[in-house]
Amino acid sequence: MIDGPIKVFLMPHSHDDVGWLKTVDDYFYGADQSTQWAGVQYTIDTVVSELANDPTYKFSIVETAFLYRWWNNANQTQRDLIKRHVKSGQIEFINAGWCMSDEANPYYEDIIDQMTIGFRWIKDTFGVVPTIGWHIDPFGHQATNAALFSQFGFNAWFFARIDQQDKSVRMANKGLEMIWHPTQYSGIDNYIFTHVNYYHYSPPPGFCFDNNCRDEPIRDDPTLDNYNLVAKSEKLVEYFKNQSLHYRSSNLFHTLGEDFHYANARMWYKNVDKLLNYINARPELNVTINYATPGEYLKAINQESNVYPTKYDDFFPYSDCDHCYWTGYFTSRTSLKGFIRDMGRYVTSVRTHLGLLKVAGSSDYIKANTKETEEALWEAEMALGILQHHDAVAGTAKQKVTNNYILTGCKALAILNKHYNEVRKEQIKNDISETVATINLGTIWNGTAADWGISAVLATNKSVLVNLYNPGPKGTYTIRLKVEEQELNIISSAGTTVAGDLICSNTQDTKDCDVLFNLAFEETSTSYVKLVPVKSGGSAKITKLKSITITESTRDFNLSSTASLKYTRSLQKFDLTTSNGNLSFTVGYNYYESYQSDGQKSGAYIFRPANDTILTPKKYSDIKTVHYAEGEVNTIIVLEGDKTYTRMYFSKLAKYVDQNGFEMETLISPINISDRIGKEIVLNLATTLQNNKTFYTDSNGLEEQKRVVDYRPTWPLVQFEPASGNYYPVNSHISIIDVNTKQRVSVLVDRSQGGTVLRDGSLEIMIQRRTTMDDSRGVGEPLDENGISQKVRHFVVIGDGNRAVQKANDQRIITCWANTASATFAKHPAPKPALPVQDTVKLYLRPFADDSYLLRLMNFDTSKSVNRQLIADYRQHPCWLDHH
């Protein structure tokens, strides 16, 4: 126990999920109260009013998405009052992103963006900059978040959920506060003071005074038989003295609130006032308690000279009981995860494109519609901010809320595309002197030819203009468009014929085909081609699928001068030879049966396999037929299973970014649970590499974490779940390295998924899951998405090229198409970069209506510094860069 007096910093707060059991709108307005009693507008109303009654009252506000709505509905008196509380220090904004984002699933770009819009609005509205991170509810914590929070300028961050075994050790060693110094391969020295809450993010047990709490109120009239002030005060003092056994400071921090509390703030402050007045008037108790904010607590402990332990790794995976690993949500609602990731990369690219056009003064549409264009970006950014919430991208909200999340994103995209399409039409006219009435976005990469609609135009013997914007680095890329089978010429804007393939690799829909061709791009540039229907001899070579029979021993494919492929049918084994080395591998699809007996069930949060499949998942999809097509641009292998349909694309371009690997596209049929057994589907890439139980996963797509099976760096692990206890979030890639040859193999993902390497050489990624039971973590329903077929993409890379593939995947070509009256180009523009940026640098440019810009640069190659002046044009918009 701490010698001397104990000072307790009691923090009033409300944890307000930006969607979970109810939609964001319902949570704000207090609708659908039968599902959950919550109304955030009432919380802010009553807190702002109550704080005016006593200058010692404090409150911390976290989720800017709700505060923004409240502010827009508030009258001037309310606005003035909350500003007064902020200025006096009674209200502190902590975290202050648009939401409290998940940590396992968001991409680092989307984390930064949702924090940026929150920070900017808080700064513009209240003139303050948040200094405290607050992540009390995410289900595990990434090292990248610690690094980013340090770079955001946060002095500390607070959270509640760490593994039960880890917390037991830290409580015994007084290690619940630490300096987190995440290992950064970039060499950047980031560290941040980290506090783990003593009792979740709740009030002390027995001291909850909210509308929905059942604890006794404080009765302070000694003439009453049920007078309890003294007993309750002594109980609270004893509680904090016990807490002091587990921290190094005589200053203690504790939360006072829970989910959607303080809709009646008077109940809280009136009851707690009685306790504080009684305890603080009695120095013999050796405890003083005051309302506080996290910033005040941090200031107090900074006056001391305590030494804190250092943390270098991360806090994954998280478990709260022996068989309760929260690793299912790494994959839950994979379609939602894919939508959010696609939307994030798309909005990032469109925003930068609009910024480059504006700063160059090359768009009359943007000049005339500056305010409207910025509002469209703002709508998209707010929607994306909501989607980063720890029950949104995590896939742990109710189904009706998930549907609303998707609707929110779709509405925002529709607003953005309304303006972006006009800009693209304008650019087409400026670049090639063609006027198009309607432009169509070809962003449905997982759609069919019928979804795209190009063939409906080609069928009328009319040509199609394709507008291609490259938001990324200079290079040659393979373009893939969805069409039906027919003879086509591909004409470049230079007037030359482009060689390509037209391959119908969908045996289930013979009209669903791909036209593939290679095209060279400058960085941040636009290119054009036309698809012209011809009677015969088109430049897009029609290549038919052929079958590899079970009796055929092997099939060899010559991919390029540096790469070849051999497939052994009887073993279903591939041997890929590249300039980065050779790789022998098999592809399989297995499944774990969900645990559904007594005890912890598998559900939206928890992945717990049934006992008989813990280490031996069952085969999910039998590969019945193998097809192939050898085109000019790609060789395609098709693995047709009874529940999966896989297309593997091997590039034949020697300098293509994917040359030292391949792309794999898997269509997963709806999971059948007619037997009422949940199923959790995994992709297994089995290689011959010996990785000695060690593998690597990225951290939010930014850094990399070393993982060792059945091992934790900071405590002696007792493993109760050998499968789920070794699962980790994969946002960008999972890799293994052979201990003898040092060969590296990585699998890159197109959305967040869970992954592991339970057996040497076998990379396992969970790609879909469906359960029949709830896992008792609050959502109150099983993860039962009915009838969903899902297409996912993976990129397998040999060697160290995963950064290049990741960058290309982040900055995908944005494809638009339109009807055109001519089969030729009247003008022949040479592609030129909107801005010359190094190929190791990723550019983010956000334009604002006041003619200001937010510039952010990500340097993927830390061995090279970047020092460049970006000159917009003669209108003088310099943006200076010195980032490395």
Regions found by a protein language model. Name each.
Residues 4-7, 53-59, 87-92, 125-131, ...:
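Loop/turn elements at helix/coil->beta-strand transitions in domains of secreted/extracellular proteins
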Residues 43-48, 81-86, 111-122, 229-246, ...:
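Structured alpha-helical segments in the cores of large, soluble enzyme domains
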Residues 13, 118, 149, 255, ...:
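Conserved, mostly hydrophobic/aromatic
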Residues 1-113, 122, 209, 346-352:
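N-terminal catalytic cores of secreted or lumenal carbohydrate-active enzymes
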Residues 109-144, 151, 238-253:
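CE4/NodB-like, metal-dependent polysaccharide N-deacetylase domain
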Residues 1-5, 51, 270-289, 295-884:
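Terminal accessory/anchoring regions of large secretory-pathway or extracellular enzymes
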Residues 17-39, 62-72, 95-112, 127-140, ...:
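The substrate-binding groove and active-site-proximal loops of carbohydrate-active enzymes
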Residues 150-254, 258, 278-290, 294-295:
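Active-site-adjacent pocket scaffolds in enzyme catalytic domains
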